[in-house]
């Protein structure tokens, strides 16, 4: 019932947002198609463009070249139209480390991105030591079920930090808990 109430409160905004969602064609598409689609949305005036997931694109014979072409082509379209692109990807297979190499896709995404955020789910919830920057609370223990790792922050602070969250998917609610301290801090 709480989720329905939240939907009712935000229905107008959600309906407006829904008109800005496209589905890919039924078949897998090439990165060139996605690049053209991103450019078209940017020229139409969309400020934030999201591709979720970029890893669903048709595999190519030369992914390192095609990834680089895609990123540079998208970057050109976005910069001329003052738009931003969010690419959603997944963890690379058989990788358990939390770093830029743990994301699926080529190095072009790592090298040419402004920011890389990695979402880590904790099932069961994880106990961590945290601080809240700017609030004199000191260290505290907290149980979280999601972590956002800031793997790259080219034009901002926070690279290498991790932020703990409690997300209640049933009620579509979340609460930031603070910055997770690394062991030994």
Where in the sequence are the language-model features?
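Conserved helix-turn-beta segment of the N-terminal RecA-like "Helicase ATP-binding" lobe
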Residues: 1
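C-terminal regions of RecA-like/P-loop NTPase motor modules
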Residues: 4-14, 28-49, 76-81, 94-185
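Short, conserved active-site loop motifs that form the nucleotide-linked donor/cofactor pocket
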Residues: 16-20
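Flexible beta-alpha connector loops of hexameric P-loop NTPases
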Residues: 22-28, 58-68, 97-101
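Conserved P-loop NTPase "ATPase switch" module shared by AAA+ and STAND
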Residues: 44-60
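Structural recognition of the conserved hydrophobic beta-strand(s) that form the central parallel beta-sheet
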Residues: 50-52, 83-90
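A short alpha/beta connector and helix-capping loop motif
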Residues: 63-77, 84-85
């Amino acid at each position: 019932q709480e989720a329905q109430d939240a939907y009712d409160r935000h229905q107008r905004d959600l309906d407006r947002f829904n008109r800005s969602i496209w589905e890919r064609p039924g078949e897998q598409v090439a990165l060139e198609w996605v690049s053209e689609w991103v450019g078209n949305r940017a020229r139409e005036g969309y400020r934030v463009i999201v591709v979720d997931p970029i890893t669903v694109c048709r595999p190519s014979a030369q992914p390192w070249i095609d990834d680089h072409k895609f990123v540079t082509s998208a970057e050109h379209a976005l910069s001329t139209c003052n738009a931003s692109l969010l690419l959603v990807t997944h963890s690379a297979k058989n990788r358990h480390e939390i770093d830029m190499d743990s994301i699926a896709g080529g190095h072009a995404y790592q090298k040419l991105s402004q920011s890389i955020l990695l979402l880590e789910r904790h099932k069961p919830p994880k106990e961590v030591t945290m601080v809240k920057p700017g609030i004199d609370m000191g260290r505290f223990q907290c149980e979280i079920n999601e972590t956002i790792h800031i793997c790259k922050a080219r034009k901002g602070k926070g690279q290498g930090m991790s932020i703990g969250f409690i997300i209640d998917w049933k009620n579509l609610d979340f609460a930031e808990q603070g910055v997770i301290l690394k062991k030994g801090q």
